[in-house]
């Protein structure tokens, strides 16, 4: 959830041409996502070693959140780029 929230905050800041804040939130999203990805990798490695692991709805839900957070982080970067181009085309400085 933290990565998703930071990505949304990055998009909101970009919309208002606050790109320093947008970049900061993007990097927070990236750090949070890296932490989650590390945990996911540890679980996958344990499964690959043959360690028994219960797959329940909570694990599926966690994987769904990780996937969505990853996608949203990339989308927030695209919004940042788009809003920077819009600002440049308008010739606005904020």
Identify the meaning behind each predicted range:
Residues 1-94:
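Terminal alpha-helical segments
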């Amino acid at each position: 959830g933290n990565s998703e929230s930071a990505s949304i905050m990055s998009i909101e800041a970009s919309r208002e041409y606050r790109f320093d804040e947008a970049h900061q939130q993007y990097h927070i999203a990236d750090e949070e996502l890296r932490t989650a990805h590390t945990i996911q990798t540890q679980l996958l490695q344990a499964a690959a070693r043959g360690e028994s692991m219960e797959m329940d709805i909570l694990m599926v839900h966690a994987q769904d959140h990780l996937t969505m957070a990853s996608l949203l982080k990339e989308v927030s970067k695209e919004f940042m780029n788009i809003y920077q181009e819009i600002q440049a085309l308008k010739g606005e400085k904020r």
